[in-house]
Amino acid sequence: MIAPRTRTLSLLAVSTISCLALTGCFSSGSSGSTPAADGDDRVSLAMLQPPRSGLTPLSDDAFKLSRWSAAETLVSLDDLGEAQASLATSWEQSSPTEWTFTIREGVSFHDGTPLAAEDVARSLTAAATASPTPRILDGVDMTAAADNDTTVTVTTAVADPLLPQRMSSPQLSILAASAYEGDTVDPINAGTGPFVLTAVDGTSGATLDRFKDYWGETAAASGIDVQFVPDGTARAAALRTGTADVVEAIPVSQVAQIDEDLVFEVPMPRTNTLYLNTDSGPFADPAVRAAAREAIDRATIVSGVYEGRADVAEGLLGPALPWAADERDNDYQTVLDQRPEAAPVDGVRISLGTFTDRAELPEVAVQLEQQLEAAGFIVEQDVREYQYIEADAVDGAFDAFILSRATVLDSGDPVAYLYSDFACEGSFNLSQFCDPAVDEALEEAAALPAGPERRSAIIAAEAEILARDAAIPMLHERVIQGEAASVEGAVRDPRERALITEETSAR
C-alpha cells in the first residue's frame, strides 16, 4: 500500500535560516545522515503541528498520543478497517444497542496502576460527557459501565453496527485515573503504550521514554524526542542534515533537496473533488454536469500542480482504502454507463470557488478554469480564506466548488463522509444534492456490519453518486514522510494514527 519512493532530480542547498532554526532542537540528534549515532537509540521526530488543546485525548491532539504509541484504545483497525484486539481481547453484541468488551489482563498504566474495567468505563464516560463532544462521538448517545473487573458494557441510544470500529479512535484512548484528577485530561504518565509521555514543552516539543512494563513487546528505541516544526522548509532541513530521524509532511517543493532514499509517499484518505451545484444554476442540468466531467483532465492536474505526487481519481475513494478498487466491478460500470451525454456549453457562465488555506487549491482552480473554458464554459473564480468562504459554499452560493475532502473519518469507515456530502439531509452537502436512490443506497450501507457486504454496499453507493455527477473526484492526495537511513520500523499510515511504535528504531 506504500507508494513508491520518490525520484528526486538533484540535491540542492537548503536555507541556512531553516537549518539554524532546527539546531539544538533534538537532544539526541547529531549531524550527518545517522542522527541516532554513538549508541543513542532514541528516535528524534519532527512533527507538522503543535498541540492545540494541551494534548487532551478528547481533541484532535489524541492523534499525536497515538502516533507516539503513548496511549492505546480498546481496539485497533486493520488495512480493511476491521476491528482487531488491543486493550480489549474480544467483544460481542449482546443486543442491537449493547456491546460487551473483555479487557486484556496484565496491563499496567504508566503510573503503575493496573488496567481494570472501571478504568475503561471512566475514560469512555469522560469522552461521552465532554464538551465539546469528541468528533468520533458527534451525534452518538453512549454510556459505558463496568460489569466486573474484566468486562465493560457500552450502550448506545440506537443500534450502532460500527461501535467496535468507533472504539479504535484515539479520542477514546484509555487513561489512568490520575489523568482525570484536574480540570483537563492530562495524559502525562497515564497511558498504556510502549512509550511513556514524561514531559511536554508547550507547543515546542515533547519527551517520551521506553515503558519497561509494557504488556506487549518492549520498545526497540529507548525514547522519542519530539519537536513541533510548522515550517516545511525547516522540517525538510532537519531530515537532510540529520537533525531528525523521522519527519512528518515534507512539502513537495522540498523533496528535490533530499536524498531520494529518505522520502516515502503515503496515500491519504483525502480526495480533491469538484462539487457541482445540482439544485440551481447551469449544473442543475445533468447534461451540463456531464460536460464539466468530460472537460476535466485529471492527469494534467496531478502532473502540473502536484508534480506527479498524487493519484488520479477513479472514484471518490482512493488507494488509502485498498479494497475500494477491487469492488468496482462490471455492475459498478453498468451504473456509470447510465450517465447522460454531455450538452454543448458554449458561453455557459459558472462561478468556481475554493480557498487559500491549502496552497495547491488555487493552482488547481487555475488549471480547472483553463480546462473548463476550453470546453466552452466561462469561468469566474472566487478564492478566499476558508473561514470566509465555507458558509457560502455550504449555502450553495457557487456553481462549482473545489475541496480537498477527507473520505474516512475516525471510525475508519467512509459511510459518514458519503452521507454528510451526498444524502438529502447531509450536513456538508456542497452539491445541494438530493436523490432517493442515493439515500437508499447510503442507508443500506450504513445498516450493515463491518465486512465484505458493507464494503460492497459502500461502492454501490459511490456508483450511484458518480452516475449523477453530483461531484467529480479529481485526485487522491499523498503525504511525504521522511526517514533517516538508520530508521527501521517507522509506520507509513494513511490514517495517521501510527508512526513510532515498539518496533521503530534509529540506530
Question: Predicted regions span which residues?
Answer:
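Ligand-site clamp/hinge motif
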Residues: F211-A256
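Extracytoplasmic/peripheral linker and loop segments enriched in polar/acidic and small residues
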Residues: Q387-I389, Y419-A484
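Alpha-helical secondary-structure segments
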Residues: A116-S123, D149-T155, G193-P194, A221-G223, ...
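N-terminal lobe/hinge region of extracytoplasmic solute-binding protein
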Residues: A46-S94, T125, A190
